């Protein structure tokens, strides 16, 4: 009788683990601040409009001479890999140079990459101080445009945001981007919907 109870308990445990999917290991759980910004087509994108969706975020700018081109290339590769696996995820690129990055400029920048706007929005429509504060509060990310400079200091991470608007993980977006880990975590986050 004890053996049957033990086996039953073990089977129930295995069943629950299999049904629950994988968990995000050590989630960051940063709360994304409410926002409403403009995308490359001049349309509003907000935290509210992303509610219930899993999304990836990064910080870039169109005049970037260093890390933004490889970051955008890697995010483009990631977009293709996610689409190949039929994984539903949005991509949000926040401009860290909003004074220069108007919607038209963002669209022109994106045209340099074989990406799709189907699920990718490049955002602007805020002041420099607003994006610096938003990045710090929401993503614990530093964004700073030194006075008199045309380059902006910013994080090079990709961020996974869950359907509840919390940042779950961050990943290197420049070197050795962990595509398989990101895809696995996106799948896990999708079970939280």
From Swiss-Prot:
Q: What is this protein called?
A: SCO1 protein homolog
Task: Give lipid-anchored residues (N-palmitoyl cysteine).
Answer: 19
Its membrane topology is listed as: Lipid-anchor
What GO CC terms are in its UniProt record? plasma membrane
Give the lipid-moiety residues, type S-diacylglycerol cysteine.
Answer: 19
List of residues binding Cu cation: 64, 68, 154
Where found in the cell? Cell membrane
Domain Thioredoxin as annotated: residue spans: 26-191
Q: Name one GO molecular function term.
A: metal ion binding
InterPro entries to which the protein is assigned, alphabetical: SCO1/SenC, Thioredoxin-like_sf, Thioredoxin_domain
Provide this UniProt record's keywords sorted from A to Z: Cell membrane, Chaperone, Copper, Lipoprotein, Membrane, Metal-binding, Palmitate, Signal
Question: What biological function has been recorded for the protein in this entry?
Answer: Necessary for insertion of copper into the active site of cytochrome c oxidase. May play a role in copper homeostasis or redox signaling.
Q: How does it assemble?
A: Monomer.
What is this organism's lineage? Bacteria, Bacillati, Bacillota, Bacilli, Bacillales
Name the protein family. Belongs to the SCO1/2 family.
Quote the Pfam families the UniProt record gives: SCO1-SenC
Q: So which residues are the signal peptide here?
A: 1-18
- Domain of life of the organism in this record? Bacteria
